[in-house]
Amino acid sequence: MGRTLVLIRHGQSEWNLKNLFTGWKDPDLTEKGHAEAIAAGKKLKETGVKFDIAYTSALQRAQKTAQHILEQMGQSDLEMIKSAALNERNYGDLSGLNKDEVRQQWGEEQVKMWRRSYTIAPPNGESLRDTGARIWPYYLYHIQPHILRSQTVLIAAHGNSLRALMMALEGLNGEEIISQELATGIPIIYTFNPDSTISSKTIITP
């Protein structure tokens, strides 16, 4: 299976469970999060996918998700490259705060703009556009060359960083991407044509 890219949002983290804005903070996976990653690895093994290289962010929730997947696939020794370019969107001053409490303080509409607007960033944080501006060049220079050499690549990262990447891959606009939701621990498999356009997209459901 050449020219293949598998994206997966990390398994549930401790801060997902506590309903906190996480961003660049580094909480561990919950027990459920570990189980989600293990289940994803088993599902991917069933598809016949075999990875040539893996990429992940600098944050442990994504790294441990990738490790679980590779272990389940019998590829625990595979090279795994870690880069902050793949980190979650930086939520700035909201990081570590409870989402419901932030809504009470700032109002539902303001928080919705911070979370779902393509261009508006929370205080001292990143917008989704900012996130894409660091992820897309990294993808083009470091990850896409593997795919163009007919290799299969795993990226274990985060909800917003992967949404920003998917936006560029699929040619979505700012309005279209804000409606895209990524569940934890669910693999998305892209295959590509020789000219790097998408040939197929498959979501591996539990």
Swiss-Prot record:
One protein family per Pfam: His_Phos_1
Reaction catalysis annotation: (2R)-2-phosphoglycerate = (2R)-3-phosphoglycerate
Catalytic residues (UniProt): 10 (tele-phosphohistidine intermediate), 88 (proton donor/acceptor)
Annotated site location: Transition state stabilizer: 158
Pathway involvement of the protein, from the record: Carbohydrate degradation; glycolysis; pyruvate from D-glyceraldehyde 3-phosphate: step 3/5
Highest taxon above the source species: Bacteria
GO molecular-function term, one example from the UniProt record: phosphoglycerate mutase activity
Biological processes, Gene Ontology terms: gluconeogenesis; glycolytic process
Family: Belongs to the phosphoglycerate mutase family. BPG-dependent PGAM subfamily.
Quaternary state and interactors: Homodimer.
Function recorded in the entry: Catalyzes the interconversion of 2-phosphoglycerate and 3-phosphoglycerate.
Protein name, per record: 2,3-bisphosphoglycerate-dependent phosphoglycerate mutase
Organism of this sequence: Bartonella tribocorum (strain CIP 105476 / IBS 506)
Gene: gpmA
